[in-house]
Amino acid sequence: LGGDGHYVTLHRMSPPASSKKESKQPKHTPLMQQYFRIKAEFPDTLLLFRMGDFYEVFYDDAKRAAKLLDITLTTRGESGGEPIPMAGVPHHAMENYLARLVRQGESAAICEQVSEPVPGKGLVERKVVRVVTPGTITEEALLESRQENLLAALAGSGKRMALAWLELASGRFMVRELESLEEVEAQIERLQPAELLVEEGSGVVLSNTDRVHSRAPWKFESKQCRKMLREQFRIKDLVGFGIEDSPLAISAAGVLLDYLQETQRTALPHLQGIQVEQADEFMHLDAISRRNLEIEASMSGEQKHTLVGILDSSVTAMGGRLLRRWIGNPLRSRVRLAARHKAIGALQAGLDYEPFREELRGVGDVERILSRIAIKTARPRDLTTLRHALGVMPRLQAIAEGGDKDLKQAAGELPAFPDLHELLERAIIDEPPMLIRDGGVIRKGYDEELDELRGLSENASEFLLNYEKEQKEITGISSLKVGYNRVHGYFIEVTHTHQQLVPTEYTRRQTLKSAERYINEELKVFEDKVMTRRERALALEKHCYAALLETLLGEIEPLQHLSERISRLEVLCAFAERADRLNLVQPDMVDSEGLHIEGGRHPLVEQVQDEPFTPNDMHLDEDTRM
């Protein structure tokens, strides 16, 4: 029994028979041979080896996992003449254990059974389908909803470097060229990547992160990286991204893409391009200044009493993440700042932000849902959340249309995708189960063949009632029951007091405290028919679901643009609400050098002190400096 209350499987395996002609090399069982072959590809990563309803770990991995996850370390028979250290976790609790590993900075290779067990046919085929690392997670349960989970790579050294970063859970892919280690540390402090990939032997030492992983020098070769990027984005060159003549930027971006392909082992269609972040477009804040200003984390590490904590009143997770990006990377462009200020002012007029916020509350995290659709890990409830979000779009459009020109401009274009919304309405039931493997996800009427296959299972209860009545008449047992459970299947139940009346053609299936359960040939035939139909129905339902994901995948790019627009509107509404609630005013931006504040208040201090804050004036110019 593990420390968390889950049972760990124990299996007996006899050691190979000894022989005088045995070689000195230990003989391993076929299962362990398969394990060693796969483990050789991932020597430094925990290998979670699927065996039935459990993921097992062996040898040194088992010892590590037992400590990291607080689960029981045991042994599994012998192989090669030695006991096999083993631990395991139930497959249905896998996400919880992955979350605990990721929080500790660990990675895990997920090895699945990719063929069905067939009696007499030897081992089932197994292969690693994905490597989960701290910087590549996409599951909702493993992510902080309002914080980006970034994977970054650094190329170069000295005065010429490039930093690339992306969030697999959203598809945002950025790169920035840097000129000093101090600039690198400033960006690391801002981005807080979950993993940072650097060139092995580069000598780069960073003081503000311990999430550094070395990659082989050949992986940073710009020629190979350029080829990978062109293939991913299906383009002839990188001119459109602005990095065609930037070999370090190409190397950093290419290393990220290579790492994703190595760990995810699937296409990444939601990575649509690379954006270059120009240093002169944003205010430079060094790492120490960022910490002292308590922008996203206080000096004690808390997030509550920070600038973001005070200004983030967003009602969606994706809006909250964009708000953090805006505050953490202040603009220098007066044109772009003026556009934001104008939009916030338009939303403040008549409290027009409130109707938008009310509708946006139920939109959900569309940005991350789209990424899961792209890598085909989206769950049924992801699709119902997307369906609801698409259903909200016409109402958001109506709110914008009801306002003036400035309000329409602030809201931006919000396409509704009526065809996709209608498809999701037809395809998915209102409240589906969590996983497609549980079945019961596709709505009745969506697929005629699926409806037919489900028909027999749904009518089984009527058959059982009639069959029970018939068997009572045949046997003369008035208390006889015909039923079904998931473990033993269909059964005929007879109490111990009527055992003498049980027909000889009944075969015992289960013994209870006060009754025996049987099955006969007729009920077995019915059971086989129903179970076959259920299996076929589930297979067809999975096929329908996969086809639905493919349809959504074809619209992934415009849907990503929609999620960006929703996030932008959400942040503008949040700023408008904060401006009203906290009595904040827009600054006047001028060409001359200086800073003039009248009745200024410190946004953090006034929120944490008990007595009213005393406003202060400040006037700085070229003759008056701090």
Spell out what each predicted region is.
Residues 11-346, 354, 358-374, 378-469, ...:
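Charged catalytic and DNA/RNA-contacting regions of genome-maintenance
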Residues 1-12:
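N-terminal amphipathic/basic-hydrophobic helices that include classical n-h-c signal peptides
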Residues 113, 268-277, 470-483, 577-599:
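Long, charged, glycine-rich C-terminal linkers/tails
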